[in-house]
Swiss-Prot record:
Keyword DNA-binding among record annotations: no
Cytoplasm recorded as keyword: yes
Residues in the signal sequence: none
Subcellular location: Cytoplasm
Organism for this UniProt entry: Synechococcus sp. (strain CC9605)
UniProt name for this protein: SsrA-binding protein
Length: 166
């Protein structure tokens, strides 16, 4: 009976390792009000996959555009792989194609064109052996909106702390 428990624990640990966060754009959640999210695939070359798995991706300045009916990821820096020669390495800031269903792309295109919203990369995560990018439909926050959101967050934190004390 003890062996079965060890196998289950090992399997759970393997699943947790297979589904992990590789990069997070925390700044985007501060600068934008995220209205909707979408998980997409991302077209990468081998050295980019190795660099992302090593945590060498920066989503902070990134944005997404819809061109020719395709989602494209711009200005996301993925560092060159250290153990590959310069000839085989990738361009760190190249435009990358995102993989999503046609109806999802059309839905986001309508929202971006109509309301003046923007598409922002939020996080890179590993799902099994696939690297997925979560993008968000965001509306830019003004300075007073950021302050109000920070104040609301702090008040929720205070209420939670007070509830735990009693």
């Amino acid at each position: 009976m003890a062996k079965g428990g060890a196998k289950k624990a090992a399997a759970a640990a393997a699943r947790a390792a297979a589904n992990r966060m590789l990069a997070d754009n925390r700044q985007a959640r501060h600068q934008y009000e995220i209205l909707e999210t979408l998980e997409t695939g991302i077209e990468l070359v081998g050295t980019e996959v190795k660099s992302i798995r090593n945590g060498k991706a920066n989503l902070r300045d990134g944005f997404c555009l819809i061109r020719n009916g395709e989602l494209q990821l711009h200005n996301v820096h993925i560092s060159p792989h250290t153990h590959a020669g310069n000839y085989f390495n990738h361009d760190p800031l190249r435009t990358r194609k995102l993989l999503a269903h046609r109806r999802e792309i059309d839905k986001f295109r309508g929202l971006v064109d109509q309301k003046g919203l923007t598409l922002i990369p939020l996080s890179l995560q590993l799902k099994g052996s696939w690297i997925k990018l979560t993008i968000g439909l965001g509306k830019g926050r003004k300075l007073h909106d950021k302050r109000a959101a920070e104040k609301e967050k702090q008040s929720k934190k205070d209420v939670k702390a007070a509830m735990e004390r009693y």
